[in-house]
Amino acid sequence: MNRCWALFLSLCCYLRLVSAEGDPIPEELYEMLSDHSIRSFDDLQRLLHGASVDEDGAELDLNLTRSHSGDELESLSRGRRSLGSPTVAEPAMIAECKTRTEVFEISRRLIDRTNANFLVWPPCVEVQRCSGCCNNRNVQCRPTQVQLRPVQVRKIEIVRKKPTFKKATVTLEDHLACKCETVVAARPVTRTPGSSQDLRAAKTPQTRVTIRTVRVRRPPKGKHRKFKHTHDKKALKETLGA
């Protein structure tokens, strides 16, 4: 019993010394030590062990909170730096006029235009083509050296519900060299009065369309039955005058 009281007094003195030198001791620990439930060294160890576990957990939670808040602030600062800082953006480089690898689709028209009931394998291949931009809109990136390359593909047909494989040859076009060349644009034709085309049109004789009116002659009227047999015109006039 005396040993427990000695340990208790020494612990109180140690706590006072620690509180004077460093962080303050929690009041809960003094309340637990002042309780008469401590009857043995094991009770004191259990009490201190439980208190140390609680303190370690609180310290761990505090450290985690500090670390998470620090990480969040650091990530937030990085995000602001990447979005708002102009030093992150790299200078833009022009896409030079040169040969680049492109994907070329092998269509069925290149193999057989009369039949469409087959498949081509492989469906696409890689070719070298000129691409890029030039310094002026009046020039374009065009190939200056071209090479034709024949390749062999498979033509797969379904005959009587069974696949048949045939070989076919397709000629591919590869660009070996490129250059920015001037594009000759078609100039719009502006006609001015007195131009050569107008003079030619003036010299060309114009055909006049003349409309003729054709009079349709009516058939002669027949003689009356009374004067049908009178052939002498003079006698006929005298008869009519009478």
Curated annotation (Swiss-Prot):
Residues 21-81 form a propeptide. Glycans are attached at residue 63. GO terms for molecular function: growth factor activity; platelet-derived growth factor receptor binding; protein homodimerization activity; superoxide-generating NADPH oxidase activator activity. Residues 233-242 have a biased composition (Basic and acidic residues). The keyword Phosphoprotein does not apply. GO terms for cellular component: basolateral plasma membrane; cell surface; cytoplasm; extracellular region. Residues 219-242 are annotated as: Disordered. GO terms for biological process: cell chemotaxis; cellular response to mycophenolic acid; embryonic placenta development; heart development; metanephric glomerular mesangial cell development; monocyte chemotaxis; negative regulation of gene expression; negative regulation of phosphatidylinositol biosynthetic process. Residues 1-20 form the signal peptide. It is found in: Secreted. CDD domains: PDGF. Residues 219-232 have a biased composition (Basic residues). InterPro entries: Cystine-knot_cytokine, PD_growth_factor_CS, PDGF/VEGF_dom, PDGF_N. Keywords: Cleavage on pair of basic residues, Developmental protein, Disulfide bond, Glycoprotein, Growth factor, Mitogen, Proto-oncogene, Secreted, Signal. Disulfide bonds join 97-141, 130-178, 134-180. Belongs to the PDGF/VEGF growth factor family. Antiparallel homodimer; disulfide-linked. Antiparallel heterodimer with PDGFA; disulfide-linked. The PDGFB homodimer interacts with PDGFRA and PDGFRB homodimers, and with heterodimers formed by PDGFRA and PDGFRB. The heterodimer composed of PDGFA and PDGFB interacts with PDGFRB homodimers, and with heterodimers formed by PDGFRA and PDGFRB. Interacts with XLKD1. Interacts with LRP1. Interacts with SORL1 (via the N-terminal ectodomain). Interacts with CD82; this interaction inhibits PDGFB-mediated signaling pathway. Growth factor that plays an essential role in the regulation of embryonic development, cell proliferation, cell migration, survival and chemotaxis. Potent mitogen for cells of mesenchymal origin. Required for normal proliferation and recruitment of pericytes and vascular smooth muscle cells in the central nervous system, skin, lung, heart and placenta. Required for normal blood vessel development, and for normal development of kidney glomeruli. Plays an important role in wound healing. Signaling is modulated by the formation of heterodimers with PDGFA. PANTHER family: PLATELET-DERIVED GROWTH FACTOR, PLATELET-DERIVED GROWTH FACTOR SUBUNIT B. This is Platelet-derived growth factor subunit B. It comes from Canis lupus familiaris (Dog).
